[in-house]
């Protein structure tokens, strides 16, 4: 008798749960989820001089975005960055530098000090933007785009250190992320520029 009562209770519970499950419906027929891949052309930032830089002016160009620092072991990459910029700038290629103080406080200077350092030590002529944050809660909008797959459509990434490179194709879309230690003159980078 005890087993029969237990069986009846189990059956009643099972059927009551089935009814509840059948009554819950999620209507997805009229819902369309659209994730549109963004591009860099939506961004406007300030350069080191305080002038507005509009990324939409770069349509049709390949772009390398790199976070920079003046007091880093990788700072000599400025020389290689400037070299490839000079060599390929007339072939629809541009480098955009974003000074950042996120790693070891290796970019403590003001915008004016950064501009002076870049010019005096490396003759930098490629566009340098206002100092920004490239990670954490105060990460700037363009780096949110670069590091979040939901925005760039390619991949999630963390900025590992100073001089991480983001390669943007002619349509303003993120195409590749290059590690900080990889030189700007690496064959994989040059091949991408020339392709």
Question: What is each stretch, according to the model?
Answer:
Residues 2-8:
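Sec-dependent signal peptide recognition
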Residues 61-62, 71, 75-99, 118-122:
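Conserved helix-turn-beta segment immediately C-terminal to the redox Cys motif
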Residues 141-144, 148-195:
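Thiol-/selenol-based redox modules, centered on thioredoxin-like
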Residues 112-161:
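Short, internal strand/loop/helix patches
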């Amino acid at each position: 008798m005890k087993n029969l009562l237990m069986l009846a209770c189990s059956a009643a519970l099972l059927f009551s749960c089935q009814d509840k499950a059948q009554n819950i419906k999620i209507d997805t027929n009229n819902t369309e989820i659209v994730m549109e891949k963004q591009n860099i052309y939506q961004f406007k930032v300030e350069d080191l001089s305080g002038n507005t830089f509009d990324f939409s002016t770069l349509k049709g160009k390949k772009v390398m975005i790199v976070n920079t620092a003046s007091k880093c072991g990788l700072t000599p990459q400025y020389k290689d960055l400037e070299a490839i910029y000079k060599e390929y700038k007339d072939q629809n290629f541009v480098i955009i530098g974003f000074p950042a103080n996120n790693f070891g406080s290796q970019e403590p200077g003001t915008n004016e000090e950064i501009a002076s350092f870049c010019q005096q030590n490396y003759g930098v002529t490629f566009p340098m933007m206002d100092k920004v944050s490239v990670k954490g809660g105060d990460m700037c909008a363009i780096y949110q785009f670069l590091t979040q797959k939901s925005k760039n459509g390619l991949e999630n990434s963390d900025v590992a250190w100073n001089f991480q490179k983001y390669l943007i194709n002619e349509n303003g879309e993120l195409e590749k992320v290059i590690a900080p230690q990889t030189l700007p003159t690496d064959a994989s980078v040059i091949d991408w520029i020339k392709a």
